[in-house]
Structure formats: structure tokens, C-alpha cells
Design a protein with these regions (language model features):
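N-terminal leader/linker segments that precede catalytic domains of diphosphate-processing enzymes
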Residues: 1-238
């Protein structure tokens, strides 16, 4: 919170539940370009999706309202990104983990497909990943969105096969506007490099959440340490 402000029970809070992939090759992380024209690179991943029934349930229980801080369109209309009164916040988060009708951590292939498979960056039919934990921000006032917000991001680590490792190394050797590889220093500095006169941020702030050295700071999940294998279904194939 800012300036000693107190968040009241009826204060409106913006909340977002997301998942992010740590995809590491050597000492560098694979990042993809943000699709909302920020020009910045970020981890593969995005906001969890819920079903229409789930949204109705949330309206009935917690009186949630749509989050309009990011334009609601075809790609974002079912995002688990909402606003609600602070009085419901704890129960809302608890419900997300236990009862929510949504994408689950045992199959996080949707964003992987949209950001890597559909764009032909990689051509894989299966992925394996390990659950690392959850990053949770403090409840703070967002200067960007002018609202109190709390952001949750489940972090998973890709466990590539030998063939997939080869593919990733080949990607790292080639340049593309769709993706980039960045080490921890670049990510922590958000891509700013004064020595080379790169003074504009090119990496999104939330990218730091996937760094290997930050894993010990993540909150524990019931699934923490579990590994999942998910078959990939190409959305371009009917």
C-alpha cells in the first residue's frame, strides 16, 4: 500500500491469476514478444481461463465485475482477471485453488500452443514440466491502472527432451522478432544496457518471476515438485 493508506473492506481490488513457463537453455531464458503491442518480451504463459459457468458462480458468490484495465476482447474475455471488493479476497483466492472450474496446473498447454506452436517457433507434440511454486505480489495500489491489485502467477519449468533441447539451442543461435533469449542480468535490468546505448526497456517486469535464483522465494503449492506430461494438439489442425 502507498502512503500508509488502509484498504477498506469495500475497496475494489483487481486480481489476476496467471501461469508462466521457465524455459532455460544454458544460462538464458526463452521469452516471447508481448501480443498487446508493448514491444516487450516476456515468458511464455498467460492468465488462466475459466468457463462461463465459473464466471456466473463468481458473480453470485463474490459479486465480481469485469476488469476493464486491459481491453476485453476475444482473447481475454474468459481470463481469470477480475475485480471484487477486498472483503471477499481471501475466500476468492481459496476457492481458486480448491473449487474453481478453470484451466488446471496439470494441463497448461493452451498458452504454450498459442505462443510457440501456432507461430511455428517449435513443432512439438508433447511437453513435460515441473511445478516450481507461486509468486504472489503484495496488495498494493497500481500506478499504471490506478486501482489496488494483487497478482498471482504459478511458475512451471519446462523439462525438455534431448530432441527438444536441440531445437531450443538452434533457436538460440538464430534471431527473430517473435522471441529472444535473455540471461538473468538482462532480465533484471529489463533489457536496459547503457553501455550499448539501449536505454529503453525491452523486457516485461514480471519476467523476473521465472528466474531460477528466485524459486526459493515462491509460495508453496500442493502440486509443488510434481511433473506433468501433456500432449500437444495443434489448434491449426482441424
Amino acid at each position: 500500500m502507498l502512503r500508509g493508506d488502509i484498504v477498506k473492506k469495500d475497496s475494489i481490488v483487481r486480481i489476476s491469476f496467471a501461469y508462466l513457463f521457465r524455459i532455460k537453455v544454458g544460462n538464458k531464458y526463452l521469452l516471447v514478444k508481448n501480443e498487446r503491442n508493448t514491444g516487450k518480451y516476456q515468458p511464455v504463459g498467460g492468465v488462466y481461463k475459466f468457463t462461463e459457468n465459473e464466471k456466473m458462480e463468481l458473480k453470485n458468490k463474490f459479486h465480481v465485475i469485469d476488469d476493464d484495465r486491459i481491453p476485453i476482447d476475444k482473447s481475454s474475455k474468459d481470463d481469470y482477471r477480475l475485480q471484487l471488493e477486498n472483503r471477499y479476497l481471501k475466500k476468492f483466492i481459496k476457492r481458486f485453488d480448491k473449487k474453481a472450474n478453470r484451466e488446471s496446473i496439470d494441463n497448461l498447454s493452451r498458452e504454450f500452443i498459442e505462443e510457440l506452436i501456432d507461430k511455428e517457433i517449435v513443432n512439438w507434440n508433447q511437453i513435460n514440466y515441473r511445478v516450481c511454486g507461486r509468486h504472489i505480489t503484495n496488495l498494493e495500489f497500481s500506478q499504471h491502472f490506478q486501482i489496488y491489485e494483487i497478482l498471482l502467477a504459478d511458475i512451471v519449468e519446462l523439462l525438455p527432451t534431448k530432441d527438444q533441447e536441440i531445437d531450443l539451442k538452434k533457436l538460440a543461435e538464430n534471431s527473430s522478432d517473435l522471441y529472444k533469449f535473455a540471461d538473468a542480468y538482462e532480465i533484471n535490468s529489463l533489457g536496459v544496457d547503457p553501455k550499448n546505448k539501449k536505454l529503453q526497456e525491452s523486457i516485461a517486469t514480471h519476467t523476473k518471476k521465472i528466474l531460477q535464483e528466485n524459486e526459493g522465494n515462491l509460495c508453496k503449492l500442493p502440486e509443488q515438485g510434481k511433473c506433468y506430461r501433456v500432449n500437444i494438439i495443434d489448434s491449426n489442425v482441424e
